[in-house]
């Protein structure tokens, strides 16, 4: 019998378990992960951006807290007194506006962001050209730049978090959830593909883009669907000035990766 079962052993499920175990040591927690190597996991394959460039206060506060955690990650994940360092590239984050509507929203968001203490700068086309002379930005009306944001090593974060949770008593289980046992509208058990049933008091849906599918298995729907994202790695023949994770008004992103860069776009028109 478990106190809590996390469906998903990536960063979302892992951090949920870590917070619970810090608050209440001794909880019996299991994390069910269908890809324990994380070779196909969204957490490991993401661009791993960490930013304060949000339009909702709740998201911004969570991101500010995330900065605290990742900024002290090594000490927070220490095992036997030994820090578990995490690489965090604080090279900045930028959104570009290509339409008047995007520029207006960006200016409105800037008021919220700076009002909550975030370091965010608005750049017009001239200032943007000075900062990124290698970028073609003649169709950019406005940009917002957060110099203290960036990206981290997602696989390093995953493995360190997993080891820390296991040291705190959490159990990671390889498996695929196929259904839930329920009684009086409450989930009481999680059934896995191999046939075993795990009894629990609470279930946390931490499956990210697949959260909608898991919720349907519980008997209700949430507006969460997976979106395909295409990413490519490339290198430049000529040297480019240092820059952070950058996203234009069409949703195309680019950031440094090793000796080159990764670029990609989410296909919103292919939801599901």
Q: Which functions belong to the PLM regions below?
A:
Residues 101, 132-140, 181-188, 239:
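A short, glycine/Asx- and small/polar-enriched loop/turn
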Residues 34, 125, 177:
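Active-site loop/turn elements of alpha/beta-hydrolase fold enzymes
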Residues 48-131, 251-253:
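Dinucleotide-binding Rossmann-like beta1-alpha1 core, especially the glycine-rich loop
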Residues 2-30:
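N-terminal Rossmann-like FAD-binding beta1-loop-alpha1 element of flavoenzymes
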Residues 18-24, 34, 43, 50, ...:
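Active-site substrate-recognition segment that forms the wall
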Residues 12, 37, 210:
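Conserved Rossmann-like nucleotide-cofactor binding loop
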Residues 144-202, 206, 210:
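Helical element adjacent to the flavin cofactor pocket in flavoenzyme catalytic cores
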């Amino acid at each position: 019998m478990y106190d809590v079962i996390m469906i998903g052993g990536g960063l979302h499920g892992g951090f949920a378990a870590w917070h619970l175990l810090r608050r209440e040591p001794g909880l019996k927690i299991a994390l069910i992960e269908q890809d324990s190597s994380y070779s196909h996991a969204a957490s490991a394959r993401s661009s791993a951006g960490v930013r304060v460039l949000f339009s909702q206060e709740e998201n911004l506060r969570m991101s500010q807290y995330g900065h605290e955690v990742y900024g002290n990650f090594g000490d927070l994940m220490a095992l036997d007194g030994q820090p578990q360092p995490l690489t965090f590239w604080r090279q900045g984050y930028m959104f570009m506006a290509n339409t008047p509507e995007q520029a207006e929203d960006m200016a409105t968001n800037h008021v919220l962001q700076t009002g909550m203490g975030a370091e965010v700068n608005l750049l017009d086309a001239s200032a943007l050209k000075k900062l990124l002379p290698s970028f073609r930005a003649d169709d950019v009306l406005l940009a917002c730049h957060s110099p203290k944001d960036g990206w981290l090593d997602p696989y390093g974060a995953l493995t360190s978090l997993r080891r820390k949770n296991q040291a705190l008593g959490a159990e990671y289980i390889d498996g695929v959830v196929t259904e839930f046992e329920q009684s009086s509208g409450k989930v009481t058990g999680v059934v896995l593909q191999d046939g075993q049933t795990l009894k629990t008091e609470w279930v946390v849906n931490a499956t990210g883009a697949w959260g909608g599918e898991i919720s349907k298995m519980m008997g209700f729907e949430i507006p969460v669907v997976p979106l395909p994202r295409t990413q490519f790695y490339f290198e430049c023949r000529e040297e480019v000035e240092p820059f952070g994770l950058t996203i234009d008004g069409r949703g195309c992103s680019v950031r440094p990766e090793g000796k080159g860069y990764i670029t990609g776009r989410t296909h919103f028109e292919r939801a599901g």
